[in-house]
């Protein structure tokens, strides 16, 4: 599960997703942990048009009514990432998986490898591809 991610768009540019041109402003977030709960750049659907924007990185269950409940729920479980294998049966994701999808912008992410009880971060990126997308809800 990638909880640590980065994105870099060095200058204003137009990207294409399918046939849709999308204007992106410069972005430079070298490393961010999902556990910081900061906004993250995404492409989201508004009136059948993909638009860039910042969104909260965490799927908040629909039964959470306020900030205090959210903080308490984080102590019990995390909803930063939802595995695709169970997305249609996951109680938290079921309510939004068909209607609230987005593309999470990324240039790289980090996975950890354990060697002799020591964990080491590995930066994973796509060669010759400065920007890619991860499915999000």
Predicted segments, located by residue:
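Short linear sequence motif anchored by a di-proline
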Residues: 1-137
């Amino acid at each position: 599960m990638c909880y640590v991610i980065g994105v870099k768009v060095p200058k204003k540019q137009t990207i294409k997703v399918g046939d849709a041109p999308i204007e992106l402003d410069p972005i430079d977030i070298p490393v961010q942990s999902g556990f910081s709960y900061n906004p993250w750049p995404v492409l989201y659907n508004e009136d059948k048009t993909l638009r860039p924007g910042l969104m909260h990185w965490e799927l908040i269950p629909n039964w959470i009514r306020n900030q205090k409940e959210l903080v308490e729920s984080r102590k019990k479980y995390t909803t930063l990432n939802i595995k695709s294998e169970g997305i249609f049966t996951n109680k938290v994701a079921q309510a939004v998986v068909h209607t609230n999808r987005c593309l999470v912008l990324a240039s790289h992410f980090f996975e950890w490898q354990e060697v002799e009880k020591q964990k080491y971060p590995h930066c994973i990126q796509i060669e010759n591809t400065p920007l890619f997308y991860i499915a999000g809800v």
